[in-house]
């Protein structure tokens, strides 16, 4: 590194970061990413994006009113705007029944928004089975990731569907853990 320290000082005048402005900006970075999500802007005003496929585990935490729900909605909307249902499927788990229900009829969903702890646990068990199935498919095709698998089936003209990414969003994870306990914890540990 450098022998320097960077200190961020809050701006006297705040600027609004428009989700629309960033999502409509057709930067080449979007095309390079499997699952691009909008984070915001950096101090120079450049759009900050994240490839969720390269960040398979993401925890959003903060105090009440800090903007966690806004952040989660930005992540989901980024996926909806930039990737088709054939490319990305979603499982949305909302034990408090208030935050994610508005997404109930979107084509990206593998199942309607889940609000019951038992169904949440079952959906994560499905993910575990699907993960094992996909490992087997990748192994059989001699590849290591979804991109290579999808490319290989096209190259070999194999009549099978491409594998979409699956993104699981759990709102209020602590509440879900409190109601389901150790079983859920071990399932999530295996998925991780």
Residue positions per predicted region:
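Hydrophobic positions on the alpha1 helix immediately C-terminal to the Walker A/P-loop
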Residues: 71, 75
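P-loop NTPase motor-domain active sites and their immediate coupling elements
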Residues: 2-37, 41-43, 47-49, 54-55, ...
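The conserved Walker
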Residues: 64-65
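P-loop NTPase switch/communication element
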Residues: 53, 80-125
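Short hydrophobic/aromatic beta-strand immediately N-terminal to the Walker A/P-loop
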Residues: 58-59
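Conserved lysine of the Walker
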Residues: 68
């Amino acid at each position: 590194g450098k022998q320097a320290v960077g200190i961020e000082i809050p701006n006297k005048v705040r600027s609004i970061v428009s989700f629309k402005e960033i999502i409509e900006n057709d930067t080449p970075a979007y095309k390079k990413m499997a699952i691009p999500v909008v984070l915001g802007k950096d101090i120079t005003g450049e759009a900050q994006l994240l490839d969720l496929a390269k960040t398979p585990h993401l925890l959003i935490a903060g105090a009440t009113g800090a903007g966690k729900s806004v952040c989660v909605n930005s992540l989901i909307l980024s996926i909806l705007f930039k990737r088709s249902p054939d490319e990305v499927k979603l499982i949305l788990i909302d034990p408090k029944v208030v935050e994610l229900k508005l997404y109930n009829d979107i084509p990206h969903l593998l199942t309607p928004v889940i609000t019951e702890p038992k169904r949440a646990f079952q959906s994560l068990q499905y993910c575990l089975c699907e993960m094992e199935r996909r490992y087997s498919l990748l192994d059989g095709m001699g590849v290591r990731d979804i991109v290579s698998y999808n490319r290989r089936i096209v190259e070999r003209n194999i009549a099978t569907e491409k594998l979409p990414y699956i993104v699981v969003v759990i709102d209020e994870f602590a509440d879900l853990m409190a109601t389901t306990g150790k079983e859920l914890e071990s399932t999530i540990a295996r998925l991780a």
